[in-house]
């Protein structure tokens, strides 16, 4: 009798994706982040569902309902903080996952890579709208500032902003629609993740050497299921340390003040995972230019495959490109720091230099280093 795992129409799909999947024998811990992102998404959907049962998307009661969740709902505080800090874990895994893709040349799987970029944009949009929901000072002013950026679009900008707001300012209509979008988007993310996985399994996974591994494959289960569980335990450990010991470490104190349209906070800044893009936005004095730079800071990932000049796939054996990659990582950390600083000297200058370096490294230095390495190897 055929094993039900291999014959049942539905279980067969799961089997071919997670159990009998042929995987390269040498993929490292950097390949763990895909499964960790799946776990983060499930965690966010579950905690979000329980929060939505008690949350009210009305400007008069939103802030109070979040307080009510933390004070009166059974274990509401832990659900709320797991959701808030789970988003931070989600982005840590996302950045690691994208970084690994760039380092090991996974962007040569163009369909998988492009769906991944779409996923990144969707997750960022979801996180932004989620930040607005508690209706604290930073929620309100963050929503006002970021949505206002769309007014920089020529001709249709102002109409577009008012259409998104549902009025002439960020108000009840804005909060209600942001809640609706924040609820539906994670399910769209889950569907996109399935497409992402589908495209990946068409080609098979990349590996640290960047070579074809068809001649040396091992089953995903038990080897990589066990390996992924180790990563999962470390992720849960980090999350729970954050939630139980310093849940507000990554938040903003201003968000514990109810939203007040008449009082602007001294420094409006988004959550830490958007600070690098926010720093790039602020480094350009022109509004439209800043918005374009902001979008391009993420969209630039789409042209990374076109800028791949090296005849080797990954950076495993390319020291020059490795140096540039870690320069880029250091640059992004600098931008993250600058995004949280006030707009004054010397932070403005540092931000502008770091923004120029970000685009210069990806668009010019990395393709040149690939060509130099080809020449050094006489290829």
Curated annotation (Swiss-Prot):
UniProt keyword Amino-acid biosynthesis present: no
A GO CC term assigned to this protein in UniProt: mitochondrial inner membrane
Pfam families documented for this protein: Cytochrom_B_C, Cytochrome_B
Primary site of residence: mitochondrion
Effect listed in the UniProt record for changing residue 345 to H: In strain: Isolate SMG-7470
GO biological process, one term: mitochondrial electron transport, ubiquinol to cytochrome c
Topology class, membrane: Multi-pass membrane protein
Annotated binding of heme b b562, by residue: 83, 182
Cofactor note: Binds 2 heme b groups non-covalently.
Transmembrane segments: 33-53, 77-98, 113-133, 178-198, 226-246, 288-308, 320-340, 347-367
Residues given in the record as a ubiquinone binding sites: 201
The keyword S-adenosyl-L-methionine belongs to this UniProt entry's keyword annotation: no
GO molecular function: metal ion binding; ubiquinol-cytochrome-c reductase activity
InterPro entries: Cyt_b/b6_C (IPR005798), Cyt_b/b6_C_sf (IPR036150), Cyt_b/b6_N (IPR005797), Cytb/b6-like_sf (IPR027387), Cytochrome_b (IPR030689), Cytochrome_b_C_euk/bac (IPR048260), Cytochrome_b_N_euk/bac (IPR048259), Di-haem_cyt_TM (IPR016174)
Binding of heme b b566, residues: 97, 196
Localization terms from the record: Mitochondrion inner membrane
Family that this chain belongs to: Belongs to the cytochrome b family.
Additional notes on this entry: Heme 1 (or BL or b562) is low-potential and absorbs at about 562 nm, and heme 2 (or BH or b566) is high-potential and absorbs at about 566 nm.
Oligomer and partners: The cytochrome bc1 complex contains 11 subunits: 3 respiratory subunits (MT-CYB, CYC1 and UQCRFS1), 2 core proteins (UQCRC1 and UQCRC2) and 6 low-molecular weight proteins (UQCRH/QCR6, UQCRB/QCR7, UQCRQ/QCR8, UQCR10/QCR9, UQCR11/QCR10 and a cleavage product of UQCRFS1). This cytochrome bc1 complex then forms a dimer.
Function field: Component of the ubiquinol-cytochrome c reductase complex (complex III or cytochrome b-c1 complex) that is part of the mitochondrial respiratory chain. The b-c1 complex mediates electron transfer from ubiquinol to cytochrome c. Contributes to the generation of a proton gradient across the mitochondrial membrane that is then used for ATP synthesis.
Matching PANTHER family: CYTOCHROME B
Protein name: Cytochrome b
